[in-house]
C-alpha cells in the first residue's frame, strides 16, 4: 500500500477507472457477440440494428479512453464487412 497521500488517492482513482473500463469492455464484447449471432442466423434487420448499437458503444469506449480509436475503427470496419457479405 502507498504511503504518500497523493498515491493513496491515485490507488482509489485507478480502481474506479479499472472497474469502469472493465464494464465498458464487457459491454463491447456482449454487443459484438449479439451482432455475430444475428449475422450467423442470417437476420439482416437484426444484424443492421445490432451493428448500429455496437458501433455506438465502440465510439463511446473511445471517448472514455477505454480503447484506442484505431482499435475501434478496426473492429467496426470488420463488423461492417461481415454485414455487407450477408447481402
Swiss-Prot record:
Keywords: Ribonucleoprotein, Ribosomal protein, RNA-binding, rRNA-binding. GO terms for cellular component: cytosol; small ribosomal subunit. Belongs to the bacterial ribosomal protein bS20 family. It comes from the Bacteria. Binds directly to 16S ribosomal RNA. Signal peptide: none annotated. One of its GO terms (molecular function) is structural constituent of ribosome. It comes from Corynebacterium jeikeium (strain K411). This is Small ribosomal subunit protein bS20. One of its GO terms (biological process) is translation. NCBIfam families: S20 (TIGR00029). Gene3D superfamilies: Ribosomal protein S20. InterPro entries: Ribosomal_bS20, Ribosomal_bS20_sf.
Amino acid at each position: 500500500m502507498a504511503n504518500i497521500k497523493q498515491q493513496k488517492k491515485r490507488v482509489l482513482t485507478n480502481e474506479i477507472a479499472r472497474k469502469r473500463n472493465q464494464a465498458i469492455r464487457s459491454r463491447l464484447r456482449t454487443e459484438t457477440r449479439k451482432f455475430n449471432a444475428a449475422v450467423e442466423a442470417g437476420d439482416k434487420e437484426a444484424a443492421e440494428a445490432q451493428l448500429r448499437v455496437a458501433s455506438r458503444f465502440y465510439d463511446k469506449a473511445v471517448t472514455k479512453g477505454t480503447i484506442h480509436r484505431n482499435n475501434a475503427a478496426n473492429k467496426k470496419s470488420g463488423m461492417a464487412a461481415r454485414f455487407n457479405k450477408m447481402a
